Amino acid sequence: MDRTLKLPVGIDNFEKIRKSGFYYIDKTKLIEQLLQNWGEVNLFTRPRRFGKTLNMSMFKSFFQIGTDKSIFDGLYISQNTALCNEYMGKYPVVFISFKDVNGLTFDRAYDALVQIIGEIANGFSFLMNSDKLSKNEKEQYQGIIQIKDGKYHMSDGVVISSLKVLSQLLTKHYGKNTIFIIDEYDVPLDKAFQHGYYDEMVELIRGILGKVLKTNDYLQFAILTGCLRISKESIFTGINNFKVLSILDARFDEQFGFADDEVKNLLADYGLASHFEEAKEWYDGYHFGNVDVYCPWDVINYVDNLVANPTARPQTYWINSSGNSLVRRLINIADSTTKDEVERLIAGESIEKVVHLELTYNEIEKNIDNIWSVLFTTGYLTKVGEVKLPDSENYALKLVIPNKEVREVFILQIQEWFKEVVAKDNDEIRVLSKAILEADNEKIQRQLNIILDRMISILDTKARDRQKENFYHGLLLGLLRGSNPNWLIKSNRESGDGFSDIIIKPEDPDSGIIIEVKYATSFQGLDKSCEDAMNQINTRRYDAVLREEGRCNIIKYGIAFHKKRCKVVSDK
Protein backbone atom coordinates (compact mmCIF):
# COMPACT_ATOMS: atom_id res chain seq x y z
CA MET A 1 0.00 0.00 0.00
CA ASP A 2 1.06 3.59 -0.62
CA ARG A 3 2.00 4.91 2.80
CA THR A 4 1.25 8.44 1.63
CA LEU A 5 -2.45 7.74 2.24
CA LYS A 6 -3.57 9.98 5.06
CA LEU A 7 -5.24 8.54 8.14
CA PRO A 8 -8.83 9.80 8.57
CA VAL A 9 -8.53 11.12 12.11
CA GLY A 10 -11.91 12.61 13.03
CA ILE A 11 -13.26 12.37 9.46
CA ASP A 12 -16.61 10.63 9.11
CA ASN A 13 -17.60 11.77 5.61
CA PHE A 14 -17.39 8.78 3.25
CA GLU A 15 -17.15 10.80 0.04
CA LYS A 16 -14.35 12.98 1.45
CA ILE A 17 -12.37 9.93 2.57
CA ARG A 18 -12.67 8.27 -0.84
CA LYS A 19 -12.01 11.37 -2.95
CA SER A 20 -9.25 12.96 -0.85
CA GLY A 21 -6.86 10.06 -0.53
CA PHE A 22 -7.57 8.85 3.00
CA TYR A 23 -7.08 5.29 4.22
CA TYR A 24 -10.37 3.38 4.28
CA ILE A 25 -11.21 0.00 5.77
CA ASP A 26 -13.93 -1.43 3.55
CA LYS A 27 -17.30 -1.74 5.31
CA THR A 28 -19.46 -1.66 2.17
CA LYS A 29 -20.62 -5.23 2.79
CA LEU A 30 -23.00 -3.55 5.24
CA ILE A 31 -24.95 -2.18 2.26
CA GLU A 32 -25.45 -5.65 0.80
CA GLN A 33 -26.39 -7.12 4.17
CA LEU A 34 -28.97 -4.40 4.82
CA LEU A 35 -30.59 -4.70 1.40
CA GLN A 36 -30.87 -8.46 1.78
CA ASN A 37 -32.74 -8.17 5.07
CA TRP A 38 -34.09 -4.73 5.86
CA GLY A 39 -36.99 -3.45 7.87
CA GLU A 40 -38.93 -0.29 7.18
CA VAL A 41 -37.12 1.24 10.17
CA ASN A 42 -33.67 -0.11 11.06
CA LEU A 43 -31.98 1.01 14.28
CA PHE A 44 -28.28 0.28 14.82
CA THR A 45 -27.14 0.71 18.43
CA ARG A 46 -23.41 0.86 19.07
CA PRO A 47 -21.12 2.65 21.53
CA ARG A 48 -19.76 6.06 20.56
CA ARG A 49 -16.75 6.23 18.25
CA PHE A 50 -17.50 2.93 16.52
CA GLY A 51 -17.95 4.25 12.99
CA LYS A 52 -21.72 4.79 13.04
CA THR A 53 -21.61 8.18 11.32
CA LEU A 54 -19.12 7.06 8.65
CA ASN A 55 -21.30 4.06 7.81
CA MET A 56 -24.37 6.28 7.58
CA SER A 57 -22.45 8.64 5.29
CA MET A 58 -21.57 5.59 3.18
CA PHE A 59 -25.27 4.68 2.91
CA LYS A 60 -26.07 8.22 1.78
CA SER A 61 -23.33 8.16 -0.87
CA PHE A 62 -24.56 4.81 -2.17
CA PHE A 63 -28.29 5.48 -2.40
CA GLN A 64 -28.66 9.16 -3.23
CA ILE A 65 -29.61 10.28 -6.71
CA GLY A 66 -26.69 11.93 -8.48
CA THR A 67 -24.00 10.14 -6.48
CA ASP A 68 -20.49 9.76 -7.84
CA LYS A 69 -20.47 6.01 -8.36
CA SER A 70 -16.69 5.92 -8.84
CA ILE A 71 -16.10 6.33 -5.09
CA PHE A 72 -17.19 2.70 -4.68
CA ASP A 73 -14.74 1.38 -7.27
CA GLY A 74 -12.58 -1.41 -5.87
CA LEU A 75 -14.74 -1.85 -2.78
CA TYR A 76 -16.66 -5.00 -1.82
CA ILE A 77 -20.06 -3.71 -2.89
CA SER A 78 -18.88 -2.99 -6.45
CA GLN A 79 -18.62 -6.76 -7.06
CA ASN A 80 -22.39 -7.11 -6.69
CA THR A 81 -23.28 -5.48 -10.00
CA ALA A 82 -26.95 -6.51 -9.89
CA LEU A 83 -27.46 -4.84 -6.53
CA CYS A 84 -25.53 -1.74 -7.60
CA ASN A 85 -27.58 -1.45 -10.79
CA GLU A 86 -30.82 -1.68 -8.83
CA TYR A 87 -30.03 0.60 -5.89
CA MET A 88 -26.95 2.77 -6.40
CA GLY A 89 -27.88 6.40 -7.04
CA LYS A 90 -31.59 5.60 -7.32
CA TYR A 91 -33.24 7.30 -4.32
CA PRO A 92 -33.69 10.71 -2.74
CA VAL A 93 -31.91 10.61 0.62
CA VAL A 94 -32.31 12.81 3.69
CA PHE A 95 -29.34 12.48 6.05
CA ILE A 96 -29.77 14.31 9.34
CA SER A 97 -27.67 14.12 12.50
CA PHE A 98 -29.05 14.98 15.93
CA LYS A 99 -25.62 15.03 17.60
CA ASP A 100 -25.64 18.83 17.96
CA VAL A 101 -29.16 19.11 19.39
CA ASN A 102 -28.09 20.41 22.77
CA GLY A 103 -28.69 23.27 25.17
CA LEU A 104 -28.95 24.11 28.83
CA THR A 105 -32.68 24.74 28.33
CA PHE A 106 -35.35 23.15 26.17
CA ASP A 107 -35.78 26.36 24.17
CA ARG A 108 -32.10 26.38 23.20
CA ALA A 109 -32.13 22.71 22.24
CA TYR A 110 -35.37 23.24 20.30
CA ASP A 111 -33.78 26.11 18.39
CA ALA A 112 -30.69 23.99 17.65
CA LEU A 113 -32.95 21.32 16.14
CA VAL A 114 -34.82 23.91 14.05
CA GLN A 115 -31.51 25.19 12.62
CA ILE A 116 -30.39 21.66 11.75
CA ILE A 117 -33.68 20.80 10.01
CA GLY A 118 -33.69 24.15 8.19
CA GLU A 119 -30.15 23.66 6.93
CA ILE A 120 -30.88 20.12 5.73
CA ALA A 121 -34.06 21.26 3.98
CA ASN A 122 -32.27 24.19 2.33
CA GLY A 123 -30.04 21.65 0.60
CA PHE A 124 -33.05 20.75 -1.54
CA SER A 125 -33.71 24.31 -2.78
CA PHE A 126 -34.37 22.96 -6.29
CA LEU A 127 -37.81 21.99 -4.98
CA MET A 128 -38.90 25.63 -5.25
CA ASN A 129 -38.57 25.35 -9.05
CA SER A 130 -39.90 21.81 -9.42
CA ASP A 131 -42.68 21.42 -11.98
CA LYS A 132 -43.80 18.31 -10.09
CA LEU A 133 -44.90 20.29 -7.04
CA SER A 134 -48.02 22.41 -6.59
CA LYS A 135 -48.01 25.98 -5.32
CA ASN A 136 -49.25 24.78 -1.92
CA GLU A 137 -46.48 22.19 -1.70
CA LYS A 138 -43.87 24.82 -2.50
CA GLU A 139 -45.35 26.98 0.25
CA GLN A 140 -45.00 24.03 2.61
CA TYR A 141 -41.34 23.81 1.69
CA GLN A 142 -40.94 27.57 2.12
CA GLY A 143 -42.33 27.20 5.65
CA ILE A 144 -39.40 24.92 6.54
CA ILE A 145 -36.62 27.11 5.11
CA GLN A 146 -37.88 30.61 5.97
CA ILE A 147 -35.37 32.91 7.66
CA LYS A 148 -36.23 35.37 10.43
CA ASP A 149 -33.64 37.51 12.23
CA GLY A 150 -30.85 35.59 10.54
CA LYS A 151 -32.06 32.14 11.64
CA TYR A 152 -34.38 29.46 10.39
CA HIS A 153 -37.80 29.91 11.92
CA MET A 154 -40.66 27.40 12.02
CA SER A 155 -43.91 27.08 13.90
CA ASP A 156 -44.25 24.10 16.24
CA GLY A 157 -46.51 22.31 13.78
CA VAL A 158 -44.06 22.80 10.93
CA VAL A 159 -41.18 21.43 13.03
CA ILE A 160 -43.12 18.27 13.90
CA SER A 161 -44.13 17.58 10.29
CA SER A 162 -40.95 18.93 8.62
CA LEU A 163 -39.23 15.62 7.87
CA LYS A 164 -42.41 13.97 6.62
CA VAL A 165 -43.09 16.98 4.38
CA LEU A 166 -39.57 16.68 2.95
CA SER A 167 -40.17 13.00 2.17
CA GLN A 168 -43.42 13.88 0.42
CA LEU A 169 -41.91 16.68 -1.68
CA LEU A 170 -38.77 14.73 -2.64
CA THR A 171 -40.82 11.67 -3.58
CA LYS A 172 -43.12 13.74 -5.78
CA HIS A 173 -40.17 15.48 -7.44
CA TYR A 174 -38.17 12.32 -8.19
CA GLY A 175 -40.96 9.78 -8.50
CA LYS A 176 -39.14 7.52 -6.00
CA ASN A 177 -39.75 7.06 -2.28
CA THR A 178 -37.30 8.72 0.10
CA ILE A 179 -34.68 7.06 2.30
CA PHE A 180 -34.12 8.66 5.71
CA ILE A 181 -30.85 8.36 7.62
CA ILE A 182 -31.03 9.74 11.16
CA ASP A 183 -27.70 9.66 12.98
CA GLU A 184 -27.32 9.90 16.78
CA TYR A 185 -31.08 9.97 17.28
CA ASP A 186 -30.75 9.63 21.07
CA VAL A 187 -28.31 12.49 21.75
CA PRO A 188 -31.09 15.09 22.28
CA LEU A 189 -32.66 12.79 24.88
CA ASP A 190 -29.36 12.25 26.69
CA LYS A 191 -28.65 15.99 26.82
CA ALA A 192 -32.23 16.74 27.88
CA PHE A 193 -31.96 14.24 30.72
CA GLN A 194 -28.72 15.85 31.90
CA HIS A 195 -30.19 19.36 31.83
CA GLY A 196 -33.67 18.70 33.19
CA TYR A 197 -36.06 18.96 30.24
CA TYR A 198 -36.35 15.29 29.33
CA ASP A 199 -40.16 15.06 29.09
CA GLU A 200 -40.39 18.00 26.67
CA MET A 201 -37.67 16.55 24.43
CA VAL A 202 -39.25 13.09 24.41
CA GLU A 203 -42.51 14.63 23.22
CA LEU A 204 -40.72 16.60 20.48
CA ILE A 205 -38.62 13.70 19.15
CA ARG A 206 -41.56 11.30 19.37
CA GLY A 207 -43.64 13.74 17.35
CA ILE A 208 -41.04 14.25 14.60
CA LEU A 209 -40.09 10.58 14.27
CA GLY A 210 -43.67 9.41 14.54
CA LYS A 211 -44.69 11.59 11.59
CA VAL A 212 -41.86 10.55 9.27
CA LEU A 213 -41.48 6.88 10.24
CA LYS A 214 -45.05 5.75 10.96
CA THR A 215 -47.52 5.05 8.12
CA ASN A 216 -45.62 7.31 5.73
CA ASP A 217 -46.39 6.33 2.13
CA TYR A 218 -43.40 8.37 0.93
CA LEU A 219 -40.82 6.46 2.98
CA GLN A 220 -38.72 3.76 1.28
CA PHE A 221 -36.99 2.86 4.54
CA ALA A 222 -35.14 4.54 7.39
CA ILE A 223 -31.83 3.86 9.11
CA LEU A 224 -31.19 5.24 12.59
CA THR A 225 -28.15 5.07 14.85
CA GLY A 226 -27.65 5.71 18.54
CA CYS A 227 -25.88 4.43 21.63
CA LEU A 228 -29.05 3.27 23.39
CA ARG A 229 -32.24 1.64 22.31
CA ILE A 230 -34.80 3.88 23.93
CA SER A 231 -37.94 2.04 24.98
CA LYS A 232 -40.29 1.65 22.02
CA GLU A 233 -43.15 2.88 24.14
CA SER A 234 -41.22 6.10 24.77
CA ILE A 235 -40.23 7.14 21.24
CA PHE A 236 -41.22 4.58 18.61
CA THR A 237 -44.85 3.94 19.54
CA GLY A 238 -46.85 2.43 16.70
CA ILE A 239 -43.95 2.01 14.25
CA ASN A 240 -44.27 -1.33 12.47
CA ASN A 241 -41.55 -3.44 10.83
CA PHE A 242 -39.08 -1.96 13.32
CA LYS A 243 -35.71 -3.74 13.41
CA VAL A 244 -33.29 -3.16 16.26
CA LEU A 245 -29.73 -4.30 15.58
CA SER A 246 -27.90 -4.14 18.89
CA ILE A 247 -24.43 -5.22 20.02
CA LEU A 248 -25.93 -8.63 20.87
CA ASP A 249 -27.12 -9.19 17.30
CA ALA A 250 -24.96 -11.36 15.03
CA ARG A 251 -26.21 -9.55 11.94
CA PHE A 252 -23.80 -6.80 10.81
CA ASP A 253 -21.54 -7.65 13.77
CA GLU A 254 -18.25 -6.95 11.92
CA GLN A 255 -19.41 -3.78 10.20
CA PHE A 256 -19.03 -1.43 13.17
CA GLY A 257 -15.50 -1.61 14.53
CA PHE A 258 -12.32 -3.19 13.16
CA ALA A 259 -11.61 -6.93 13.10
CA ASP A 260 -8.23 -8.50 13.94
CA ASP A 261 -7.13 -8.88 10.31
CA GLU A 262 -8.15 -5.31 9.49
CA VAL A 263 -5.99 -3.95 12.31
CA LYS A 264 -3.09 -6.22 11.33
CA ASN A 265 -3.28 -5.00 7.73
CA LEU A 266 -3.55 -1.36 8.79
CA LEU A 267 -0.47 -1.60 11.00
CA ALA A 268 1.47 -3.51 8.33
CA ASP A 269 0.55 -0.95 5.69
CA TYR A 270 2.29 1.73 7.74
CA GLY A 271 5.25 -0.44 8.73
CA LEU A 272 4.00 -0.88 12.29
CA ALA A 273 3.23 -4.61 12.41
CA SER A 274 5.25 -5.05 15.61
CA HIS A 275 2.68 -2.96 17.49
CA PHE A 276 -0.22 -5.39 16.94
CA GLU A 277 -0.19 -7.02 20.39
CA GLU A 278 -0.07 -3.62 22.06
CA ALA A 279 -3.02 -2.39 19.98
CA LYS A 280 -4.96 -5.54 20.85
CA GLU A 281 -4.29 -5.20 24.57
CA TRP A 282 -5.41 -1.56 24.65
CA TYR A 283 -8.21 -1.26 22.07
CA ASP A 284 -9.66 -4.73 21.28
CA GLY A 285 -12.02 -6.83 23.34
CA TYR A 286 -15.48 -5.53 22.38
CA HIS A 287 -17.72 -8.52 21.66
CA PHE A 288 -20.48 -7.65 19.16
CA GLY A 289 -22.70 -10.51 18.05
CA ASN A 290 -20.26 -13.35 17.34
CA VAL A 291 -17.07 -11.35 16.77
CA ASP A 292 -14.51 -9.36 18.73
CA VAL A 293 -13.79 -5.88 17.39
CA TYR A 294 -11.53 -2.92 18.10
CA CYS A 295 -12.70 0.64 18.62
CA PRO A 296 -11.93 2.33 15.25
CA TRP A 297 -11.46 5.78 16.79
CA ASP A 298 -8.73 4.41 19.03
CA VAL A 299 -6.95 2.42 16.33
CA ILE A 300 -6.85 5.26 13.79
CA ASN A 301 -5.54 7.71 16.39
CA TYR A 302 -3.03 5.16 17.69
CA VAL A 303 -1.60 4.47 14.24
CA ASP A 304 -1.55 8.17 13.37
CA ASN A 305 0.41 8.84 16.55
CA LEU A 306 2.86 6.03 15.79
CA VAL A 307 3.45 7.29 12.26
CA ALA A 308 4.54 10.61 13.75
CA ASN A 309 6.47 9.00 16.61
CA PRO A 310 7.28 5.26 16.37
CA THR A 311 8.11 5.14 20.10
CA ALA A 312 4.77 6.66 21.17
CA ARG A 313 2.92 4.88 23.95
CA PRO A 314 -0.80 3.98 23.73
CA GLN A 315 -3.15 6.72 24.87
CA THR A 316 -6.74 6.82 26.08
CA TYR A 317 -8.26 8.30 22.92
CA TRP A 318 -11.80 6.97 23.49
CA ILE A 319 -11.88 8.23 27.08
CA ASN A 320 -10.78 11.70 26.08
CA SER A 321 -13.33 12.04 23.28
CA SER A 322 -16.33 12.27 25.62
CA GLY A 323 -17.42 12.36 29.21
CA ASN A 324 -17.39 9.27 31.40
CA SER A 325 -20.12 10.23 33.84
CA LEU A 326 -21.81 6.81 33.73
CA VAL A 327 -18.94 5.14 35.57
CA ARG A 328 -18.96 7.92 38.13
CA ARG A 329 -22.73 7.57 38.63
CA LEU A 330 -22.26 3.87 39.35
CA ILE A 331 -19.50 4.53 41.88
CA ASN A 332 -21.41 7.34 43.60
CA ILE A 333 -24.38 5.10 44.43
CA ALA A 334 -22.44 1.86 44.91
CA ASP A 335 -23.22 -0.27 47.94
CA SER A 336 -20.74 -2.84 49.27
CA THR A 337 -21.90 -5.46 46.75
CA THR A 338 -21.42 -3.11 43.81
CA LYS A 339 -18.01 -2.02 45.08
CA ASP A 340 -16.98 -5.66 45.23
CA GLU A 341 -18.21 -6.17 41.65
CA VAL A 342 -16.25 -3.14 40.42
CA GLU A 343 -13.13 -4.47 42.15
CA ARG A 344 -13.57 -7.83 40.45
CA LEU A 345 -13.92 -6.17 37.06
CA ILE A 346 -10.77 -4.11 37.56
CA ALA A 347 -8.96 -7.26 38.72
CA GLY A 348 -9.75 -8.80 35.32
CA GLU A 349 -12.62 -11.01 36.46
CA SER A 350 -16.19 -11.22 35.13
CA ILE A 351 -19.49 -10.43 36.80
CA GLU A 352 -22.96 -11.73 35.92
CA LYS A 353 -25.78 -9.30 35.18
CA VAL A 354 -29.24 -9.40 33.62
CA VAL A 355 -29.06 -6.70 30.97
CA HIS A 356 -32.05 -4.57 29.96
CA LEU A 357 -31.60 -3.24 26.43
CA GLU A 358 -34.76 -1.11 26.41
CA LEU A 359 -34.67 1.76 28.86
CA THR A 360 -35.68 5.37 28.97
CA TYR A 361 -33.09 7.88 30.16
CA ASN A 362 -35.07 8.73 33.27
CA GLU A 363 -35.01 5.02 34.25
CA ILE A 364 -31.21 4.76 34.20
CA GLU A 365 -30.66 5.76 37.81
CA LYS A 366 -33.82 4.20 39.25
CA ASN A 367 -31.82 1.12 40.19
CA ILE A 368 -28.20 0.09 39.91
CA ASP A 369 -28.97 -2.79 37.50
CA ASN A 370 -30.05 -0.23 34.91
CA ILE A 371 -26.67 1.51 35.17
CA TRP A 372 -24.94 -1.83 34.61
CA SER A 373 -27.11 -2.28 31.50
CA VAL A 374 -26.15 1.13 30.12
CA LEU A 375 -22.46 0.53 30.86
CA PHE A 376 -22.78 -2.58 28.70
CA THR A 377 -24.61 -0.96 25.78
CA THR A 378 -22.27 2.05 25.74
CA GLY A 379 -19.05 0.01 25.61
CA TYR A 380 -17.67 0.21 29.14
CA LEU A 381 -18.36 -3.50 29.58
CA THR A 382 -18.57 -6.33 27.08
CA LYS A 383 -20.02 -9.82 26.99
CA VAL A 384 -17.85 -12.94 27.30
CA GLY A 385 -20.59 -15.50 27.94
CA GLU A 386 -24.07 -16.27 29.22
CA VAL A 387 -25.41 -18.00 32.32
CA LYS A 388 -28.93 -19.44 32.51
CA LEU A 389 -30.82 -18.13 35.50
CA PRO A 390 -32.20 -20.77 37.89
CA ASP A 391 -35.92 -21.52 37.51
CA SER A 392 -36.14 -19.21 34.51
CA GLU A 393 -35.80 -19.17 30.74
CA ASN A 394 -33.78 -15.96 30.95
CA TYR A 395 -30.02 -15.54 30.87
CA ALA A 396 -27.55 -13.30 32.64
CA LEU A 397 -24.56 -12.02 30.70
CA LYS A 398 -21.00 -12.53 31.89
CA LEU A 399 -19.48 -9.06 31.62
CA VAL A 400 -15.88 -7.86 31.68
CA ILE A 401 -13.98 -4.64 31.07
CA PRO A 402 -12.96 -4.97 27.40
CA ASN A 403 -9.41 -3.63 27.42
CA LYS A 404 -6.71 -1.59 29.13
CA GLU A 405 -8.08 1.74 27.96
CA VAL A 406 -11.52 1.25 29.49
CA ARG A 407 -9.92 -0.08 32.67
CA GLU A 408 -8.18 3.29 32.88
CA VAL A 409 -11.62 4.99 32.82
CA PHE A 410 -12.74 3.01 35.86
CA ILE A 411 -9.48 3.62 37.70
CA LEU A 412 -9.52 7.36 37.02
CA GLN A 413 -13.13 7.75 38.14
CA ILE A 414 -12.50 5.69 41.29
CA GLN A 415 -9.45 7.79 42.14
CA GLU A 416 -11.39 11.04 41.68
CA TRP A 417 -14.25 9.69 43.80
CA PHE A 418 -11.86 8.54 46.53
CA LYS A 419 -10.14 11.95 46.64
CA GLU A 420 -13.51 13.57 47.27
CA VAL A 421 -14.42 11.01 49.95
CA VAL A 422 -11.11 11.59 51.74
CA ALA A 423 -11.45 15.37 51.44
CA LYS A 424 -14.83 15.20 53.19
CA ASP A 425 -13.46 13.08 56.04
CA ASN A 426 -11.20 15.74 57.55
CA ASP A 427 -11.70 14.47 61.09
CA GLU A 428 -10.49 10.96 60.28
CA ILE A 429 -7.49 12.27 58.36
CA ARG A 430 -6.56 14.53 61.29
CA VAL A 431 -6.75 11.52 63.61
CA LEU A 432 -4.38 9.65 61.27
CA SER A 433 -1.98 12.60 61.14
CA LYS A 434 -1.89 12.93 64.94
CA ALA A 435 -1.37 9.18 65.41
CA ILE A 436 1.61 9.21 63.01
CA LEU A 437 3.27 12.03 64.98
CA GLU A 438 2.70 10.12 68.24
CA ALA A 439 3.80 6.71 66.91
CA ASP A 440 0.43 5.27 67.93
CA ASN A 441 0.60 2.10 65.84
CA GLU A 442 -2.81 0.77 66.83
CA LYS A 443 -4.60 4.00 65.97
CA ILE A 444 -2.75 4.33 62.63
CA GLN A 445 -3.65 0.75 61.80
CA ARG A 446 -7.30 1.25 62.77
CA GLN A 447 -7.67 4.45 60.71
CA LEU A 448 -6.01 2.93 57.64
CA ASN A 449 -8.21 -0.17 57.87
CA ILE A 450 -11.32 2.02 58.04
CA ILE A 451 -10.20 3.87 54.90
CA LEU A 452 -9.27 0.65 53.09
CA ASP A 453 -12.66 -0.82 53.90
CA ARG A 454 -14.42 2.16 52.36
CA MET A 455 -12.41 2.39 49.17
CA ILE A 456 -12.72 0.49 45.88
CA SER A 457 -9.56 -1.41 45.06
CA ILE A 458 -8.06 -0.79 41.62
CA LEU A 459 -5.62 -3.69 41.83
CA ASP A 460 -5.27 -6.19 39.02
CA THR A 461 -4.97 -9.66 40.57
CA LYS A 462 -2.51 -10.56 37.79
CA ALA A 463 -0.24 -7.63 38.68
CA ARG A 464 3.22 -8.32 40.06
CA ASP A 465 3.75 -7.88 43.79
CA ARG A 466 5.87 -4.79 43.11
CA GLN A 467 2.96 -3.19 41.24
CA LYS A 468 0.63 -3.95 44.13
CA GLU A 469 3.15 -2.43 46.52
CA ASN A 470 3.24 0.69 44.35
CA PHE A 471 -0.53 0.95 44.59
CA TYR A 472 -0.52 0.99 48.39
CA HIS A 473 2.43 3.38 48.38
CA GLY A 474 0.44 5.79 46.19
CA LEU A 475 -2.65 5.43 48.36
CA LEU A 476 -0.77 6.18 51.57
CA LEU A 477 1.10 9.07 49.97
CA GLY A 478 -2.19 10.65 48.85
CA LEU A 479 -3.66 10.35 52.34
CA LEU A 480 -0.59 11.87 53.97
CA ARG A 481 -0.44 14.80 51.56
CA GLY A 482 -3.99 15.68 52.49
CA SER A 483 -3.48 15.20 56.22
CA ASN A 484 -1.35 18.20 57.25
CA PRO A 485 -0.60 21.20 55.01
CA ASN A 486 2.47 22.04 57.11
CA TRP A 487 4.25 18.75 56.44
CA LEU A 488 6.91 18.53 53.74
CA ILE A 489 6.51 15.08 52.21
CA LYS A 490 8.98 13.42 49.84
CA SER A 491 8.39 10.19 47.96
CA ASN A 492 11.16 7.81 46.83
CA ARG A 493 13.75 10.44 47.70
CA GLU A 494 17.39 9.33 47.39
CA SER A 495 18.65 8.96 50.93
CA GLY A 496 21.70 7.16 52.30
CA ASP A 497 22.34 3.88 50.49
CA GLY A 498 18.96 3.67 48.75
CA PHE A 499 15.52 5.12 48.31
CA SER A 500 12.99 5.45 51.10
CA ASP A 501 9.32 5.14 50.19
CA ILE A 502 8.11 8.21 52.09
CA ILE A 503 9.93 10.84 54.17
CA ILE A 504 7.97 13.40 56.21
CA LYS A 505 9.43 16.59 57.63
CA PRO A 506 6.98 17.91 60.25
CA GLU A 507 6.88 21.50 61.53
CA ASP A 508 9.16 20.57 64.44
CA PRO A 509 12.69 21.03 62.99
CA ASP A 510 14.03 18.26 65.24
CA SER A 511 11.55 15.63 64.03
CA GLY A 512 11.38 13.37 61.01
CA ILE A 513 9.32 10.40 59.84
CA ILE A 514 10.31 7.54 57.53
CA ILE A 515 7.77 5.10 56.10
CA GLU A 516 8.55 1.95 54.15
CA VAL A 517 5.58 0.23 52.48
CA LYS A 518 5.40 -3.49 51.76
CA TYR A 519 2.85 -5.78 50.10
CA ALA A 520 2.15 -9.07 51.87
CA THR A 521 1.01 -12.02 49.79
CA SER A 522 -1.29 -13.19 52.62
CA PHE A 523 -2.83 -11.91 55.84
CA GLN A 524 -0.49 -14.23 57.76
CA GLY A 525 2.48 -12.56 56.09
CA LEU A 526 1.73 -9.02 57.33
CA ASP A 527 4.00 -9.27 60.40
CA LYS A 528 6.93 -10.60 58.37
CA SER A 529 6.49 -7.87 55.74
CA CYS A 530 6.54 -5.19 58.46
CA GLU A 531 9.75 -6.70 59.82
CA ASP A 532 11.28 -6.65 56.32
CA ALA A 533 10.33 -2.99 55.94
CA MET A 534 12.00 -2.01 59.22
CA ASN A 535 15.15 -3.97 58.34
CA GLN A 536 15.31 -2.20 54.99
CA ILE A 537 15.07 1.25 56.61
CA ASN A 538 17.93 0.43 58.95
CA THR A 539 20.28 -1.46 56.65
CA ARG A 540 19.96 1.09 53.85
CA ARG A 541 20.28 4.06 56.23
CA TYR A 542 17.16 5.84 55.04
CA ASP A 543 17.42 8.19 58.04
CA ALA A 544 20.67 9.74 56.77
CA VAL A 545 19.08 12.66 54.94
CA LEU A 546 17.06 13.65 58.02
CA ARG A 547 20.05 13.46 60.37
CA GLU A 548 22.08 15.63 57.98
CA GLU A 549 19.45 18.35 58.53
CA GLY A 550 19.69 18.00 62.31
CA ARG A 551 16.43 16.03 62.60
CA CYS A 552 17.34 13.50 65.27
CA ASN A 553 13.89 12.63 66.69
CA ILE A 554 13.04 10.16 63.94
CA ILE A 555 10.11 7.73 63.85
CA LYS A 556 10.54 4.78 61.49
CA TYR A 557 7.46 2.96 60.21
CA GLY A 558 7.09 -0.37 58.49
CA ILE A 559 3.57 -0.64 57.06
CA ALA A 560 2.42 -3.80 55.28
CA PHE A 561 -0.78 -4.22 53.25
CA HIS A 562 -2.78 -7.17 52.01
CA LYS A 563 -6.08 -6.54 50.25
CA LYS A 564 -8.06 -4.29 52.63
CA ARG A 565 -6.02 -4.83 55.76
CA CYS A 566 -2.74 -3.42 57.02
CA LYS A 567 -0.25 -3.87 59.84
CA VAL A 568 1.87 -1.08 61.35
CA VAL A 569 5.11 -1.31 63.35
CA SER A 570 7.38 1.56 64.36
CA ASP A 571 10.65 2.41 66.05
CA LYS A 572 11.64 5.75 67.57
Which role does the model predict for each range below?
Residues 1-80:
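Walker A/P-loop-proximal flanking segment of P-loop NTPase domains
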Residues 9-18, 108, 112-160, 188-194:
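Conserved P-loop NTPase mechanochemical-coupling segment
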Residues 10, 61-126:
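P-loop NTPase motor core
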Residues 121, 162-173, 200-220, 542-545:
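Substrate-engagement module of ASCE P-loop NTPases
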Residues 181, 187, 197-238:
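Sensor-1/coupling segment of RecA-like P-loop NTPase cores
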Residues 234-237, 245-304:
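Amphipathic alpha-helical segments of the small helical/lid subdomains adjacent to P-loop NTPase cores
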Residues 242, 294-541, 566-572:
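Extended alpha-helical interface modules used as scaffolds for assembling large macromolecular complexes
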Residues 545, 549-572:
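Domain-level recognition of nuclease-like catalytic cores that cleave nucleotide substrates
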